[in-house]
């Protein structure tokens, strides 16, 4: 069971360590060999819970990376909470699920990827990293996971500015 008081203790301890605490995007610009920690969160249901984690991290000067599923962007309260998190320095990015959503149809998946990326941009969330959503019980034919979307060289070539934290890191 998860307890916020334990997350608070963890963040407090982490803030005292001799290591760079950064977002996933910031980690890409660190000097080679620098020790760092990225707190990466997949936001798949409750933005309010993610906001609570971000509040604790912010208290200790930690900025995490929050990968948000696109459907959550349809709620104005979620957007408000995510914007506040972004103002604190947290990375708010896209937790994509497009290849599974379209049963391996890359063309349809890319259309959704473009559509949902625009939703993030229209709400002033810009990002340089993304992360795929994993669904271990999904039956797939012709592809192995959402990771395959950015493993596809043609699709990858359309987004040279993005780093998939699972595929490219």
Which residues does each PLM region occupy?
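Hydrophobic anchor at the start of a short beta-strand
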Residues: 64, 92, 127
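Conserved, mostly hydrophobic/aromatic
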Residues: 42, 95, 130
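Active-site beta->alpha N-cap acidic-glycine motif
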Residues: 2-88
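Catalytic domains of cell-wall/extracellular-matrix polysaccharide-remodeling enzymes
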Residues: 99-169
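Structural motif corresponding to the early beta-alpha repeats
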Residues: 69, 90, 94-107
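An acidic- and aromatic-residue-enriched active-site/binding cleft used to recognize and process polar
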Residues: 26, 69-71, 97-99, 132-135
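Generic detection of intrinsically disordered/low-complexity segments and helix-coil linkers/edges
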Residues: 1-4, 89, 153, 163
